[in-house]
């Protein structure tokens, strides 16, 4: 699932990201200062309104573009192109890093390519000589796996709809604990064993403890944005490696195709669970839990100013009970708030508004299944680099097209269908057509 979000300026001093950020109430002002500020604000507003009316009379369509006052024609398109290219880079880097970690592990650590077990969600084995029976077992495994995903997604949406936040946080914290401590311990142990690096258990436990503790703080509380993004990429790679190891070969490919179809239905259907989750979060003006979403920019959730198109560009601030208490001075008289005016063309506020960027949010499930596809291409079949690179390029092309559609439709879109479809097409075509062709050329010592 891929969505846009409002973000802070690139020049913002704060470099931390958190799901809960406190908003400070403005300092109470005296009655005289408030009245004086109100009079000054009214005079400035009248002067600006008269000036804008004169400009509007000269050219009515001068500063009207897509319903945004104070923005000349063509600027919206330029911003879309600018942010579109930036968003592509913002998502290409983490997706590429996640897939590189998975492929590098698959190519070097034999533990994740050895088949010595299956997940409980895929109980049917594929070790049968009959092709039909193997295909049937893979379809049955896919049905069970997709059913589990659907049930758990609906359960999560119901919990969020009825505001069971503590239960959801406990669920996510438990999952993060397993990934950051148990799976990291297994991963680090296998890597050290592969490269024949000796390490005593106290040092190993201390390393895993430090890694997991910092990750829990960054993901579920607050910390540097780059560090949180790195932890989200790492836990996605660890989860993808588990799927690559324990999913049967044919079942993995059928599951990838089925999960892309489910993602399409869950996000675009009016009653789809993921769409209901996003709409509920937007109605409540709340962020989706950071343990489920990778965000490319800072998220401000409390005290964040919101531009409401229905108010004709006026700056809307969320209601804060503390502000209501602070609006009265020590004598019990109300103090007059400052007057907020939208930035007009030619004023410094417009530059600040243009510098604001919108971030992109991509679900961690998309990272996981992207990496599963590339990792399976590297681990199964021939496992040559041509097939792996073809799947890698296909996923990036699909992600780029998805971002293009996101810029056009400006709503939450599924990120799996296009990328997974391209990846499957590139995998089977490269593995069955390109690889035999190149092997034949190499055997005859012909080079193109």
UniProtKB/Swiss-Prot annotation:
Protein family (similarity comment): Belongs to the peptidase A22A family.
Polar residues biased stretches: 19-30
InterPro entries in the record: Pept_A22A_PS2, Peptidase_A22A, Preselin/SPP, Presenilin_C
EC number: 3.4.23.-
Tissue expression as described in the entry: Detected in the embryonic brain in frontal cortex (at protein level). Expressed in the developing brain: frontal cortex, cerebellum, hippocampus, basal ganglia and brain stem. Localized mainly in neuronal cells and astrocytes.
Biological role: Probable catalytic subunit of the gamma-secretase complex, an endoprotease complex that catalyzes the intramembrane cleavage of integral membrane proteins such as Notch receptors and APP (amyloid-beta precursor protein). Requires the other members of the gamma-secretase complex to have a protease activity. May play a role in intracellular signaling and gene expression or in linking chromatin to the nuclear membrane. May function in the cytoplasmic partitioning of proteins.
Name of the protein: Presenilin-2
Listed Pfam families: Presenilin (PF01080)
Mod. after translation: Phosphorylated on serine residues.
Membrane topology classification: Multi-pass membrane protein
Main location class: endoplasmic reticulum
Region of interest (Disordered), residue spans: 1-70
Topology Lumenal: residue spans: 109-138, 188-200, 245-249, 383-388
Entry's localization field: Endoplasmic reticulum membrane; Golgi apparatus membrane
GO cellular component, one term: endoplasmic reticulum membrane
Residues with PTM Phosphoserine: 22, 25, 30, 52
Recorded name of the encoding gene: PSEN2
Signal peptide (residue range): none
GO terms of molecular function: aspartic endopeptidase activity, intramembrane cleaving
Keywords: Endoplasmic reticulum, Golgi apparatus, Hydrolase, Membrane, Notch signaling pathway, Phosphoprotein, Protease, Transmembrane, Transmembrane helix
Keyword Amino-acid biosynthesis part of the UniProt annotation: no
């Amino acid at each position: 699932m891929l969505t846009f979000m409002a973000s802070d300026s690139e020049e913002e001093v704060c470099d931390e990201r958190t799901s809960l950020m406190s908003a400070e109430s403005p300092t109470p002002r005296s009655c005289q200062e408030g009245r004086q500020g109100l009079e000054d604000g009214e005079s400035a507003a009248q002067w600006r309104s008269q000036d804008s009316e004169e400009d509007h009379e000269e050219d009515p369509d001068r500063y009207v573009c897509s319903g945004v006052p104070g923005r000349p024609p063509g600027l919206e398109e330029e911003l879309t192109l600018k942010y579109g290219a930036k968003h592509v880079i913002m998502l290409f880097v983490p997706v590429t890093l996640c897939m590189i970690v998975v492929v590098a592990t698959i190519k070097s650590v034999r533990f994740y390519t050895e088949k010595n077990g299956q997940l409980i969600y895929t109980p049917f084995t594929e070790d049968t000589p009959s092709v039909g029976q193997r295909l049937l077992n893979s379809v049955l495994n896919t049905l069970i796996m997709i059913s589990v995903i659907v049930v758990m997604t609906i359960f999560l949406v119901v919990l969020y709809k009825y505001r069971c936040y503590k239960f959801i946080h406990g669920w996510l914290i438990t999952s993060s604990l397993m990934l950051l401590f148990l799976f990291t311990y297994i991963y680090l142990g296998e890597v050290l064993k592969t490269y024949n690096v000796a390490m005593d258990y106290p040092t190993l436990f201390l390393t895993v403890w430090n890694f997991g503790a910092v990750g829990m703080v960054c993901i579920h509380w607050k910390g540097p944005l780059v560090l949180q993004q790195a932890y989200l990429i790492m836990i996605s790679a660890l989860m993808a490696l588990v799927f690559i190891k324990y999913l049967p070969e044919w079942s993995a490919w059928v599951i990838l195709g089925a999960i892309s179809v489910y993602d399409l239905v869950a996000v675009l259907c009016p009653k789809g669970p993921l769409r209901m989750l996003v709409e509920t979060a937007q109605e409540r003006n709340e962020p989706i839990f950071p343990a489920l979403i990778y965000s490319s920019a800072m998220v401000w959730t409390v005290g964040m100013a919101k531009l409401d198109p229905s108010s004709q560009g006026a700056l809307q601030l969320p209601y804060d009970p503390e502000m209501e208490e602070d609006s009265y001075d020590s004598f019990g008289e109300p103090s007059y708030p400052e007057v907020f005016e939208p930035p007009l063309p030619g004023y410094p506020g417009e530059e600040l508004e243009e510098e604001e960027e919108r971030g992109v949010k991509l679900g961690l499930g998309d990272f996981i299944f992207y990496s599963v596809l590339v990792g399976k291409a590297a681990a199964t079949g021939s496992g040559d680099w041509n097939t792996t690179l073809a799947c890698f390029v296909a996923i990036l092309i699909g992600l780029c097209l998805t971002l293009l559609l996101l810029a056009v439709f400006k709503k939450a879109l599924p990120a799996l269908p296009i990328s997974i479809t391209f990846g499957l097409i590139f995998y089977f075509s490269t593995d069955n057509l390109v690889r035999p062709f190149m092997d034949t050329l190499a055997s005859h010592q012909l080079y193109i």
